Amino acid sequence: MIQRKQTLWLLLATVAAVLTFLYPFSTGIEKVDNTTMERTVEINAAENLFLILLTIASVVISTVAIFLFKNRGQQKMLCIIGLLISLGICALDISLTLKLVKYVPALWALLPFIIVISYFLAYRGIRSDEKLVKSLDKLR
């Protein structure tokens, strides 16, 4: 299980998704309602309920996909779903950051994009495994 490269990519996606709860994507200044007051905020995955749900879904999907190593079809489907969810995380992260008056993106803002890339590379690994199995079946 662990020797397959897509398992490592899925594990990277899981770790990156968990890290989005701990580290902020960006720090910025937000206006308080319709006043002239401003406050400093840090945006991470725990800031928005929808972002929390998407991130938890991404963690669960990548973890389940790791243990479905014997069923490549389901693993591929979970990778596609995880990829779409992680694209939603990226879009929501960008929209939350752009709502700030002034913002400074952190290095951790790359984590959602790392999740997307990890899911994509895991999908490619699963697909190459399927091709390898089909070619070996033809040799029999």
Task: Describe each model-derived feature in a short phrase.
Residues 104-128:
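Alpha-helical membrane-associated segments of multi-pass integral membrane proteins
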Residues 1-2, 6, 43, 72-75, ...:
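Membrane-interface extramembranous regions at the lipid-water interface
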Residues 39-93:
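The feature represents the first ordered module of a protein
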Residues 2-3, 8, 14-57:
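Interfacial loop at the N-terminal end of multi-pass membrane proteins
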Residues 83-110:
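Hydrophobic alpha-helical transmembrane segments of integral membrane proteins
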Residues 122-140:
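Cytosolic juxtamembrane helix at the C-terminal end of the final transmembrane segment
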Residues 8-19, 53-63, 81-88, 110-117:
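Lipid-exposed faces of alpha-helical membrane segments in multi-pass integral membrane proteins
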Residues 20-24, 65, 90-97, 119:
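Structural signal for membrane-spanning alpha-helices in multi-pass inner-membrane proteins
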